[in-house]
Each structure stands twice: as C-alpha cells, then as structure tokens.
Amino acid sequence: MALRRPMVAGNWKMNGSAALAQELFKKFASKLQNDSAEVVLCPPSIYLESVRQLLEANKEALDGSLVRMGAQNLSQHDFGAYTGEVSGQMLKDCGCRYVIIGHSERRRMYGETSNIVAEKFAAAQKHGLTPILCVGESGPAREARRTFEVIAEELDIVIQKNGTMAFDNAIIAYEPLWAVGTGKSATPEQAQEVHAFIRKRLSEVSPFIGENIRILYGGSVTPSNAADLFAQPDVDGGLIGGASLNSTEFLSLCTIAMSA
C-alpha cells in the first residue's frame, strides 16, 4: 500500500489579512515541528508576497516541517489582455507550489466549465505548479444518486485533455457542494465511499496513479470531525475553508493530520 503523506490545505477564499498570516506563522514556528503532514496556505493573491516573506523569515524555525504556499485560482492563459487575471508563471514567481483548480465557487459563481477547468489544470502544470483539482456533486445530484456520475464526468474531461499521467503531479479534493460553507459535513463513511470511487476510477487507467494520488476532503472540516475523516483509508487530508481562518483551529487540524 502506498504511503501517502497527508496534506492540510487552507483556502482563505476572500478573507484573511497579513496579520492572520503572521499569527499562523508564530504558532507554526513553536508547534509545527515534523514533516509527517504537508501544510499549504492559499491566501488571496494580494497576500502571497506576505506569506512568501514569512516562509523565508521562519525557514530556520520551520526546519523539519513542510509548509508550502498555494494560490486559489489562475488563468488558463499565459499572458495577454485579461484584466484582473494571474498567470501560472506569475504564481510560480511568487513562490507558489500549488494552485486550487475548479473550486465549486469558481464553477458556480464565475461560470467555469469543466473544459476551462481542464485548461487551467494544464496551465498550472506547464508552469511547474501542482494543481489541487476540486470535484464534487450538488445536493440534488446526491439525492438523485448521481454522485459517482458527476464526479466521473469532471475527472474524465481533465483526463481526456491532459492524459492520465498528468495526475502524477496533482492532488484531488472532493468537495460535496452541499457541505461547502454550510457547516454540514459528509460523514466519514460518505467521504470514504467517494474517495474510494475516485481512486478506483483512476486506477482503471493507471494503477500507479490510483494508488499514489492524494485525495483531500473539503466541506466543513473542523477539529471535531477531522480525526474521523482523516482516519479513512482513502482520505489523505483536507481542503479547509472557514477553519483555516482561525489559527488555533487550523493548527489543530494540522496536528490531527500528522497523527492520521
């Protein structure tokens, strides 16, 4: 069985501040002292440089731990007249290692189709970034027993446009839309069922990818439910929203992942 290092990725969305970043790093420096889990901070783009500077300033204190920086979105284009957009190369220049692709809020609020998501996935990898690909079903889709169908479609478009081996450098985050930002989390059993399906789906085209890819759960993860979620055999950590804005809760989630 593959040894997949757990990951806790904090998606601040359009929240947070430079002060929050400083508070997080102060706690990281004193309490985050091993590399059994990878921690990724995904602040708004305006704060990427602040986080990069904090990573550099705390390099010695964080020695032995794995704290990385990621972005919440990128353009599928390399450059051009795309006002307000940020390219993969720009994120790489800022020090990002990861970028969230296809978050449900981007799909729903900004009309990002699965084809656009697949293009952004490719753009991230072109510039040396690891995409964190979000997939998940709506409440009505789950009630209609279409969860697997929806997720298969979202995965298959990325595979068709980028090839199976593109997932050798990717993370998948399962985020049921009915749980994102609602305070209602999937049960550990529900999460495991979907994660196992995703792993099996990828294993059908590449056993190596299926066994080794990390699959995160995202959807109202808190310190009270994280241990049970992270204990599931196919759950490799979490994509954290609201709890990532509370330094105490986020550090608790990191600690739970380290012992998962």
From Swiss-Prot:
Superkingdom assignment: Bacteria
GO cellular component, one term: cytosol
Residues given in the record as substrate binding sites: N11, W12, K13, G181, S220, G241, G242
Gene Ontology molecular function terms on file: triose-phosphate isomerase activity
An example Gene Ontology biological process: gluconeogenesis
Top EC class of this enzyme: isomerase
EC number: 5.3.1.1
InterPro entries to which the protein is assigned, alphabetical: Aldolase_TIM, TIM_sf, TrioseP_Isoase_bac/euk, Triosephosphate_isomerase, Triosephosphate_isomerase_AS
Subunit relationships: Homodimer.
Role noted for this protein: Involved in the gluconeogenesis. Catalyzes stereospecifically the conversion of dihydroxyacetone phosphate (DHAP) to D-glyceraldehyde-3-phosphate (G3P).
Family annotation (PANTHER family): TRIOSEPHOSPHATE ISOMERASE (PTHR21139:SF42)
Protein name per the record: Triosephosphate isomerase
Organism, as annotated: Shewanella oneidensis (strain ATCC 700550 / JCM 31522 / CIP 106686 / LMG 19005 / NCIMB 14063 / MR-1)
